[in-house]
Regions:
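Long, contiguous binding/interaction regions
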Residues: 1-125
Length: 125
């Protein structure tokens, strides 16, 4: 049976976020090294604050890396090879936070249970 729904337009993606998860007691040093390498190799990326306390839907300490669409094809493979055992969630920014963090997400490493109920849902037009 063929699905008659229109395909989603990738042009709605405004950019991407990568959330790098770490444990403050045991893996923050690796997260710091990764962060420094991202800053050096991808100056177009914007590094967010360190969040040792839980924030939003995230079940573990993390920092965010925001990056433009043009960087996706380079930064994602780089993270695959250089994440040093850290878990990374990569998702698009379409305006639908719930779906971006769930159905549209790519996980590198262990998939963590997000608290999706705190995210805004935006119906697709």
């Amino acid at each position: 049976m063929r699905d008659e729904a229109a395909a989603a337009d990738p042009g709605t993606i405004k950019g991407y976020h990568a959330h790098v998860y770490y444990d403050p007691a045991s893996s923050r040093d690796r997260a710091e090294r990764l962060r420094s390498r991202i800053a050096a190799d991808f100056p177009e990326a914007t590094l967010g604050r360190w969040h040792d306390a839980l924030v939003g839907p995230h079940p573990q300490s993390m920092y965010q890396v925001a990056f433009p669409r043009a960087l996706f094809a380079t930064l994602l493979p780089w993270l695959m090879l250089n994440r040093d055992g850290l878990t990374v969630l990569v998702h698009p920014e379409t305006g639908d936070d719930y779906t971006d963090h769930s159905a549209h997400a790519v996980w590198l490493g262990a998939m963590l249970p997000l608290r999706l109920e705190v995210l805004r849902r935006t119906p697709r037009e």
